Amino acid sequence: MPAVADCTVVFPLRHDPASTHPDVSGLVGKAFERVNWRDAFDTFLAEERSALWAAKTAFDNTDTSAYIAARDALFPQAVSGVHGAVAFRNRAGHKLHETMEAVGLWEYLKGGATRAKGTFTFVDVCGGPGAFSQALFAMGKEHKLRLRGFGLTLRNVKGLDWYTDLPSRSFFPCYGIDGTGDVFKLENIESLCSLTCKENVRLVVADGGFDVPTEVVNFQETISCRIVYGQWLSAVKLLRPGGCFVLKLFDCFSPFTRAILFLTTHLYESVQVVKPRHSRVVNSERYLVCIGFIGAPKQWLEHFERCYQEGFVDNDNIPTVLPTSLFSGDKIFGADVERMSATIASNQVSGLHAILEKLQSKPAMEEVKS
């Protein structure tokens, strides 16, 4: 048996309570420094990152079906199915359920919904085809809550069309001002904000991502920075005070990701990273869970928006949203993000090594071939 297993793990992220908000005034009006996604790492957990990359690279020439067979044999827990009376469309629904349950998010949301007569609105960003929305409606019913949902996703992209059985009277697709549903365009996020301006937006969920070719899979984190930031900014603009946010992340080694996490600890009352059971131990996926939106100072929001419009000029280069000098001295945050990143990476390496050993053993290879 492998030394690790698929199970839900929670990591708190905090900043030093004695510290003040990071001062972005010195960044106003300045041109954004950028770095290519291949060069977007520093020395943070460099040894752990190298070990993880090596463990992934070991499978470059492995047959995909053989890898999947060995993985599923060793880690059978991350499978789809029924939770209680709720059946989810796919594993994404299980991931969201486990993530929300792990931090008591439904109990928090029910408190706010009670004051709003049992109703609240969620927004599903980059959500097509709607696994998260479907799961939220199902779980909301279990918790005796009435939900209204709005969703933004790319239009006319195979596999991203909204599920036809999402409740038509309670779920409202949005494709932005230009009709594309492209979250990379700030005006489409603004359109979604206008559409929900009178709604009690208590929850934003964001599960966006895309397939990364095998030859650059080690750079999944930095290749995904633009879509991660777009979803993160969407929540900052959409949420009402006290609202919550669930965002899919990958590795958290780069200065960009750490800067976003640090800023997040100042924007919400409670921040945690959850690795749910259905998010396989051998992959880099994890979920950022933010509870109790405090709000962003006007200067911050202006800086965030300018970073999105002027900093992300293409998909290859990543702007500096916050210099490391503004968060590297926070020892509490540094310890939390290091523990989270190192633990998930270590578990991932152990799981990948177990799969490799199974593939290299003669009985396992014969079993896979049969």
Curated annotation (Swiss-Prot):
The keyword Nucleotidyltransferase does not apply. Optimum pH is 9.5. Changing K95A: 98% reduction of activity. One of its GO terms (biological process) is mRNA modification. Transmembrane segments: none annotated. It catalyses: a 5'-end (N(7)-methyl 5'-triphosphoguanosine)-ribonucleoside in mRNA + S-adenosyl-L-methionine = a 5'-end (N(7)-methyl 5'-triphosphoguanosine)-(2'-O-methyl-ribonucleoside) in mRNA + S-adenosyl-L-homocysteine + H(+). One of its GO terms (molecular function) is rRNA methyltransferase activity. Keywords: Methyltransferase, mRNA capping, mRNA processing, Nucleus, S-adenosyl-L-methionine, Transferase. Gene3D superfamilies: 3.40.50.12760. It is an enzyme of class 2 (transferase). Pfam families: FtsJ. One of its GO terms (cellular component) is nucleus. S-adenosyl-L-methionine binds at G130, D207. InterPro entries: mRNA_Cap_2O-Ribose_MeTrfase, RNA_MeTrfase_FtsJ_dom, RrmJ-type_MeTrfase, SAM-dependent_MTases_sf. Its main location: nucleus. The active site is at K248 (proton acceptor). S-adenosyl-L-methionine-dependent methyltransferase that mediates RNA cap1 2'-O-ribose methylation to the 5'-cap structure of spliced leader and U1 small nuclear RNAs. Methylates the ribose of the first nucleotide of a m(7)GpppG-capped RNA to produce m(7)GpppNmp (cap1). Cap1 modification is linked to higher levels of translation. Recognizes a guanosine cap on RNA independent of its N(7) methylation status. Component of a complex composed of CBF5, GAR1, NHP2, MTR1, NOP10 and Tb11.01.8210. This is Cap-specific mRNA (nucleoside-2'-O-)-methyltransferase 1. The gene is MTR1.
